[in-house]
Amino acid sequence: MDKIANAFKDKKANIGYIVAGYPSLEYSKEFLNLLDDSILDMIEIGIPYSDPLADGKLIANAAFQACNNGVNTARVFDMLKGVKTSKALVFLVYYNI
């Protein structure tokens, strides 16, 4: 939680977003590792979901393609084991009741 609090300390935070697994999990891992040298304070990682009603068309299409490639929550967290970053990571996930 310290990384998140520090991202907002005395300034506005720069937050990036990526749909995990788009276009592939390997690409996502490499991209996230490169972002460590960016101006971002925090990275929001979208966990793909088959019916992302709250997202716009671009994010929905990326999530749909990732899901079609077999990306799920467990595979995203397995991929993240290979990510080395000093940035705060937060997640966007869906939950149906």
What does each model-identified segment do?
Residues 1-18, 79-81:
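N-terminal amphipathic alpha-helix/helix-capping segment at the start of soluble metabolic enzymes
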